[in-house]
Regions:
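Transmembrane-helix boundary motif in ABC transporter permease subunits
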Residues: 67-97
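Transmembrane alpha-helices
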Residues: 124, 128, 161-194
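Non-cytoplasmic
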Residues: 179-229, 239
Length: 252
C-alpha cells in the first residue's frame, strides 16, 4: 500500500512538473495560436463538457475504436491458436502479418476510405493496425508454454478444457496484457488519425479537423487531452479485465 502511494505521488509530481513547464513556455511565447496555456485548455475542456455534442463525439469515437480493438483481440487469438497448432497456417500468415506491420497508417486509412463508409473507418483501421501486435504476442505466449506442464497434464489425464484454462490461458495472459496495452495505444492513434482524414460526422476526428482549419489551438489541445484521458481509461479497463481473468483462474 505504501509503495503504491509513493508511486502515485511520484507520478503526480511528475505530471505537475510538466504542466508547470507547459505554462511557463506558453507564457514566454504568449501566442495562443502557437501554444495554448494549460489554464486556457482546462477552461475550454470544462466548457465543452457541458455541450451535448461533446459527449456524443466521445461515445462515437470511444465505441468505434474500442470495438476495433476487441475485434483485433478476438481475431488475433484465433489466428495465433491456428498458427500454434498448424505450421502451414503460421507460414502462410507470416508475410501478411509482416506486411501489415510495415504499411504506413496513412496508406491504410486512404485504402479503407476507398473500400468502406467513413462511419466505420476507425473500426477497420484499428483492427488492421493492432491485429499484428496481438497475433505476435499471443503466438509467442503459446510457444512459451511450459512443456513440462503439458507432459504432466498428459500423465495425469487432465481434461482438454482444464488444460486450456489452467495451462494455456494462464500462461498467455501476461503476453496478452503487454501486447494488448501496446496495441491499445496504436488503436487510439490510428483510429483518431482515420477520423481526422475521413471526417465522419459526430466524431472527435471531425472536431480536430475543424480546429486545424480554423486555427483553434485551444480547442485542439483540449480534445488532445480528452483523447489522452480516454486512452488512459481504456488501459485501466483492459488491465482490470486481465486481472479479473487471472483471479477467476486462480479461484480467488
Amino acid at each position: 500500500m505504501i509503495k503504491k502511494r509513493k508511486t502515485f505521488l511520484v507520478k503526480g509530481l511528475s505530471l505537475i512538473f510538466w504542466i508547470i513547464l507547459w505554462q511557463i513556455i506558453a507564457g514566454k511565447i504568449n501566442q495562443e495560436l502557437l501554444l495554448a496555456s494549460p489554464l486556457a485548455v482546462l477552461k475550454q475542456t470544462v466548457v465543452s463538457a457541458f455541450e451535448r455534442n461533446f459527449w456524443e463525439r466521445v461515445f462515437f469515437s470511444y465505441f468505434h475504436i474500442m470495438a476495433g480493438f476487441f475485434i483485433a483481440i478476438f481475431t488475433g487469438i484465433v489466428l495465433a491458436v491456428l498458427s500454434y497448432n498448424f505450421k502451414a497456417v503460421k507460414i502462410l500468415l507470416h508475410p501478411l502479418i509482416a506486411s501489415i506491420r510495415s504499411v504506413p497508417t496513412a496508406a491504410v486509412i486512404i485504402l479503407f476510405l476507398i473500400w468502406t463508409d467513413v462511419k466505420n473507418l476507425s473500426i477497420l483501421v484499428s483492427v488492421f493496425m493492432t491485429l499484428p501486435i496481438i497475433y505476435v504476442s499471443i503466438l509467442k505466449g503459446l510457444e512459451e508454454v511450459d512443456k513440462n506442464l503439458l507432459e504432466m497434464a498428459k500423465v495425469f489425464r487432465i481434461t482438454a478444457l482444464k488444460k486450456i484454462i489452467y495451462i494455456y490461458i494462464s500462461q498467455i495472459l501476461p503476453y496478452c496484457e503487454s501486447g494488448g496495452l501496446n496495441a491499445l495505444g496504436i488503436a487510439w492513434k490510428s483510429g483518431i488519425a482515420a477520423e481526422v482524414i475521413g471526417i465522419p460526422t459526430g466524431s472527435i476526428g471531425e472536431v480536430l479537423y475543424e480546429s486545424k482549419v480554423y486555427l483553434n489551438t485551444v480547442n485542439l489541445f483540449s480534445w488532445a487531452i480528452v483523447i489522452i484521458i480516454l486512452g488512459f481509461i481504456s488501459e485501466k479497463v483492459f488491465v482490470y479485465l486481465i486481472k479479473l481473468c487471472v483471479r477467476k483462474i486462480e479461484g480467488r
